[in-house]
Amino acid sequence: VWKDECDVNVLVLCEPPSILGDFTDQVRKYYQFWDLILTWRDELLDLPNAQKFIFGCCWIEWDTFNPDKQRVCSFNTSDKGYAPGHELRQQIYAGLEGADDLNGFSVVKHRSPPRTPNKNYLFETAKYHIVVENEQRDNWITEKLIDCFASKTIPIYWGASNIGEYFNTDGMIIFNNIEELKDILDNLDEKFYDDRVEIIEENYERSKQYWDFHARVRKTIEGYIDND
């Protein structure tokens, strides 16, 4: 849409480079085309019309969500394999394929296709959920993590190195490679979860601001218009 056809032109950058390509150079070159740029990419925040905007989202379907936390660890993946996180997920799924038990924790796992109606079953009983973002990049935070905090599930997390700027990492278990994950899963226990009830609640409250992506986009644009 050409600039003179809209009252306000807004660019919202959502995906990491491995998914849609890296448009950083193009955005820098043509930044004046937009009135407002919403981005999680630090390298674009020096542009005069850019604002930091965390992707977030929450895919829990609250109308049918029935939490009953047990000794369960869950994991979800697709069959994709082109992003760094995709590749790691396939390794994890292969490692879990024959595992029904992780140090006394039952395993709930799924690889699509087929797609499931929703993700509730991954979080209703699980005290832990293995989270792998598509890339390890600062500020790249999606529903994969937010769903954990929203459902009061402790994430076993591979993702943004600066996640501590947004959430209390004392309520997370962070890993950087498959070997670290194996060690974590071999030593899972309930005590880690049960000792962090207050931190789980803190991260739940922090996560709320990121649940509704479209409402946040709308509110940010309205704020820009009001202040323009």
Segments and roles (model prediction):
Residues 1-13, 22-104, 112-228:
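Pol beta-like nucleotidyltransferase catalytic core
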Residues 17-18:
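Catalytic toxin/effector domains delivered as secreted proteins or via bacterial secretion systems
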